[in-house]
Each structure stands twice: as structure tokens, then as C-alpha cells.
Swiss-Prot record:
This is DNA-directed RNA polymerase RPB7 homolog. The keyword Transcription applies. Part of the viral DNA-directed RNA polymerase that consists of 8 polII-like subunits (RPB1, RPB2, RPB3, RPB5, RPB6, RPB7, RPB9, RPB10), a capping enzyme and a termination factor. It comes from African swine fever virus (isolate Warthog/Namibia/Wart80/1980). Contains an extended C-terminus, with no homology to characterized proteins. Induction: Expressed in the early phase of the viral replicative cycle. One of its GO terms (biological process) is viral transcription. It is found in: Host cytoplasm; Virion. The keyword Membrane does not apply. Its main location: host cell. It comes from the Viruses. GO terms for cellular component: DNA-directed RNA polymerase complex; host cell cytoplasm; virion component.
Length: 339
């Protein structure tokens, strides 16, 4: 994720006299030299965007070095990864019996450790590009390093889904706060509309949870696959439209919400029920409407960005064919696959 962050730090100044001849210019240069292109406080710093506050230049009195120091608050454009993030393009740089290593081609510099397993170890080849999901563990940003490190696995369709039980209405103020995420989804949908339709179909079908035959198609216009018939008694709700209605107090968020696997992964749809009849493996999660919508919207954003990145990365048939072994691994993990 790309974002703005504010940091506080203390800089050592070797030549206070020269530094103070043009404090702003020297300070900006010093910050860029120390932090840009490196890890710092759980982020990878891309650019210094401003100096918010600074102290005077103090002279060290604990020794006779003549050096100084300055306390600084500055803003920076940063990139950072979170647990369970999806990365569409990770290039395999090492694969042996003990470990698989990959480097992200799309995010800030990060080395990803893919724990060796019989299936993944026998499939992924050095030089190939694989889609990866980060594990439920911290991404490590060691200060001063020029790349982060993380663990993950080749991303395969998920069989499980969560059900959320909302017992309080979403307020207009909360709905307004969610419009930033809605705007991101709308921008990603606009970008998606410019992609090659054949590529979108290929990757949506690849990541559809159920195994389907070649003559079965996905209906990208209504964001459902052939297994959508199983829930035909329910009408899916467009989350984006729902939130626009919530701004006008024209919708109710009470009840049980879920995004079961019959919907396409990047679908902006969800199902809402008065009584829980979802066939989920876990008990419903009781939470506020705001928490539930933030969770759903971020999931939609992750999948939409993931699908767009897949289309951009594997942008020709030759490249797609060179990775048929990866696609086969993904297909074999689907519900209904004939082993």
C-alpha cells in the first residue's frame, strides 16, 4: 500500500556551522540520504514530502567533537505490506529442498520466503513469476535495509469465508468515512474496464473457488460464476450502491453479511440475510457495521488490484503458457477438482 506517514527522528550534524547556513536545504538532503530507498518504522520510504517541525541545532556537550543534533518531524511517501496481502508477481530466485525465495516485482523491494512444501517445491521453477499471498505474520522492515522481508505462499483459491452479524445500523457519518475506500474501488474498476477482456476472464476463472468445465463461463456482468445458482434464492447486494444509499438513510445494514465463494473474488457484491443460512464453517463474527464494511471493502480492493496486476504482468499468451505448471497447481486446489 502507498500512503503518507509522519515520522519523528533525531539527526546528528557533523558540521553545525555549515549546516545552519541553509538549514532547510541541508536538512532535506540529510533526510533523503538517510531514509529514502530504505526501511524505517515498518515502512519503505519512497520520498520525503515535507518537513513539518524542527528544533534548533543543539551542540553536543558530552564531548569536544563540535558536532550537533536536531529533532525533526517530517512527512514521507511510503510503501508497506500487511499480513495476507496479495502480490500478483513474485519472481522465484531460489528453489531447493530447503527453501523457496522470491522477489516482488510490483511492490517495494521485498524478499519473500515461501516455506518449502512438496507441491510448491516441485512446481515453482527459478525464473518463473508466481502469485503470492503473505502469511499471517509480520513483514519485517529492518531500519536501514534496502529491502523488506516476508513469508508467504503461492496463492490458491480459498474455500472458506466469514459471516458477519451486524446488530447496529451504519450511521451517515460512518458511511461518509467509508467513501475513501469506495473511491479506490471505483478507480480500480475503471482501470479494469480498460484491460483485455480475455485476460480478465482467464484469471477470474482461474481464481474461482469451484472447478468448472471449459464450456461453463463466468458472467462478469453480474459478477457470478455457474455455482451462483446455488444461492439464486438470494439477491446479492452491491456494496458500493448500498453505501451510497446509506448516506441518504435509505438502507439497513442489520443482519448477516457474507461474501461466499460463488461470487467472483473481485466482485463488489455481498449477500445480506435477516437469518443466517450461510453454509460457513465458523460461527458468525459479531461486529459493528463500520468494521464489517471496512473488512469487505478492503477485501474487494485487494482482489481487484490483484486481478489488475495479474493482467498487467501476464500480458501475452506466451507468458501465460510458460506458467501452465503454476496454473495447474491452482486448479488442483479447487472445490470439485477430480484428483
Amino acid at each position: 500500500m502507498i500512503d503518507q506517514k509522519i515520522f519523528e527522528t533525531t539527526l546528528n550534524i557533523d558540521d553545525p556551522t555549515n549546516f545552519c547556513t541553509n538549514v532547510e536545504a541541508h536538512l532535506l538532503k540529510e533526510l533523503e540520504n538517510i531514509y529514502v530507498g530504505k526501511c524505517f518504522k515498518n515502512s519503505f520510504i519512497l520520498n520525503i514530502t515535507g518537513i513539518i517541525q524542527r528544533s534548533p541545532c543543539f551542540i553536543m556537550r558530552t564531548n569536544n567533537s563540535g558536532r550537533g543534533y536536531m529533532h525533526v518531524r517530517f512527512s514521507a511517501l511510503v510503501s508497506y505490506l500487511n499480513a495476507f496481502d496479495l502480490i500478483a508477481a513474485v519472481k522465484i530466485i531460489k528453489n531447493d529442498s530447503n527453501i523457496i525465495l522470491g522477489e516482488s516485482l510490483l511492490t517495494e523491494p521485498v524478499t519473500i520466503v515461501i516455506p518449502s512444501s512438496e507441491s510448491q517445491n516441485n512446481v515453482a521453477e527459478v525464473g518463473q513469476i508466481v502469485p503470492v499471498q503473505l502469511a499471517n505474520s509480520s513483514v519485517y522492515y529492518i531500519p536501514g535495509r534496502q529491502q523488506a522481508s516476508a513469508t508467504g505462499s503461492i496463492f490458491i483459491p480459498k474455500h472458506t469465508f466469514s459471516v458477519y452479524h451486524v446488530q447496529e445500523e451504519l450511521t451517515q457519518e460512518q458511511a461518509l468515512n467509508l467513501t475513501k475506500l469506495v473511491n479506490i474501488i471505483e478507480m480500480l474498476l475503471e482501470s479494469r474496464s480498460k484491460k483485455d477482456f480475455k485476460q480478465i476472464c482467464f484469471f477470474e476463472k482461474l481464481y474461482y473457488t469451484y472447478s468448472i468445465s471449459s464450456d461453463e463461463i463466468l458472467d462478469l456482468k453480474i459478477w457470478k460464476g455457474p455455482k451462483g445458482k446455488e444461492m439464486s434464492r438470494l439477491k446479492p447486494c452491491n456494496v458500493l450502491s448500498f453505501l451510497y444509499d446509506a448516506l441518504k438513510n435509505k438502507s439497513s445494514s442489520l443482519g448477516f453479511w457474507a461474501r461466499p465463494p460463488n461470487l467472483l473474488k473481485s466482485s463488489p457484491l455481498a449477500y445480506q440475510q435477516d437469518q443466517n443460512s450461510f453454509n460457513a464453517t465458523e460461527l458468525p463474527i459479531i461486529c459493528s457495521a463500520e468494521v464489517m464494511f471496512v473488512t469487505l471493502l478492503k477485501e474487494i480492493i485487494n482482489y481487484l488490484q490483484f486481478m489488475n496486476d495479474l493482467c498487467d504482468t501476464f500480458n501475452n499468451e506466451q507468458l501465460i503458457k510458460r506458467h501452465e505448471n503454476i496454473w495447474m497447481l491452482i486448479e488442483q486446489r479447487k472445490i470439485g477438482h477430480d484428483f
